[in-house]
Amino acid sequence: MTVLTEGIAPHGGQLINRIATAAEKAEFLALAEKLPRVSLDERALSDLVMIAIGGFSPLKGFMEQDDYEKVVDDMRLINGLPWAIPVTLSVREEVADPLKEGNWIRLDDSEGNFVGVLELTQKYRYNKAHEAVNVYRTDDQKHPGVKVLYEQGEINLAGPIWLLQRDPHPQFPKYQIDPLQSRKMFHEKAWKTIVGFQTRNPIHRAHEYIQKCALEVVDGLFLHPLVGATKSDDVPADVRMRCYEIMMDKYFPQDRVILAINPSAMRYAGPREAIFHAIIRKNYGCTHFIVGRDHAGVGDYYGTYDAQYIFDEFEPGELGIVPMKFEHAFYCTRTSGMATTKTSPSLPEERIHLSGTKVRELLRKGELPPPEFSRPEVAAELIRAMQGS
């Protein structure tokens, strides 16, 4: 099912809706005990939700082999539409063997709740090493995305899905805004141009600077932190959200910013994930997307601006969303303000950069990072979280 939308066209032209109606849900629930079951981990469950609400439009389900291979090799679906990350449901061979193509499969969450169904159109084996090198640019299993890839099952189950059950987010129900809702909100605010910002980290001054630079040239900012699965050493989502709320209350014009959660999981695929994140924000109704330094990167696997260069591999207008590329921002002691090398005449020793590692070290000690790096209220919130208070 597709739905009519406001504003910029979703990826592929139509916003997908795979949320079962009450009648459809009743039909599937009547079959609940008869259907073979597959249990979803946190990432697969978030993918199910994102497909169903249209965040992954034009996908209607988990990828069949032709789409999967085309995406891995060429960053396109088989119909030629740009798409950078494979969206698959991978299971062990012993789970896949008894499943028959053409049948419905019951999808359960980790607690055994019946959350969705998959119409199994195909099951296929895939090459993990090939996917790792093409998508993540490495087969090093120390890379968190590659690690997940090598730990998951060796058979992909493909086919359209229906979402049967989705509870309000247990921590952030008021920020659970789906693509149809965000588009309606943008329309009601009369925003014609909207820039999306992806983050898995608390907002620091450099982020604030580039967001406000972007806000100078568009109508609204869609602040869209990711709350799906992340690395164990990333700042927990509840802490990050409290930091975003502080920023919204004190440092942003509230009539020009919308804060919402992004339920999808991180892949840490760097450049390819930047494309993926841009397409997701396009589906939510954004016309522009901020791409900063090492977007969706981890460690030293990607170059500082590789996630910006990858947008140049597509023809102008082909992605349907405008990347706003920003250099690494810093605090300039000469000009007493945030800047980049494009706007500051400063020497390297006049630029204040703090690594995430250094900041975490300060926070664990209960020490506030310098105000040039973080707003004091945000730093205080992070200290409370790091010290368990």
UniProtKB/Swiss-Prot annotation:
GO biological process terms held by the UniProt record: hydrogen sulfide biosynthetic process; sulfate assimilation
Protein name per the record: Sulfate adenylyltransferase
Pathway involvement of the protein, from the record: Sulfur metabolism; hydrogen sulfide biosynthesis; sulfite from sulfate: step 1/3
Coiled coil spans: none
Family stated for the protein in its record: Belongs to the sulfate adenylyltransferase family.
Domain of life: Bacteria
MF terms (GO), sorted A to Z: ATP binding; sulfate adenylyltransferase (ATP) activity
Pfam families: ATP-sulfurylase, PUA_2
Gene: sat
Reactions this protein catalyses: sulfate + ATP + H(+) = adenosine 5'-phosphosulfate + diphosphate
Record InterPro entries: ATP-Sase_PUA-like_dom (IPR025980), PUA-like_sf (IPR015947), Rossmann-like_a/b/a_fold (IPR014729), SO4_adenylyltransferase_pro (IPR020792), Sulfurylase_cat_dom (IPR024951), Sulphate_adenylyltransferase (IPR002650)
Species: Microcystis aeruginosa (strain NIES-843 / IAM M-2473)
E.C. code: 2.7.7.4
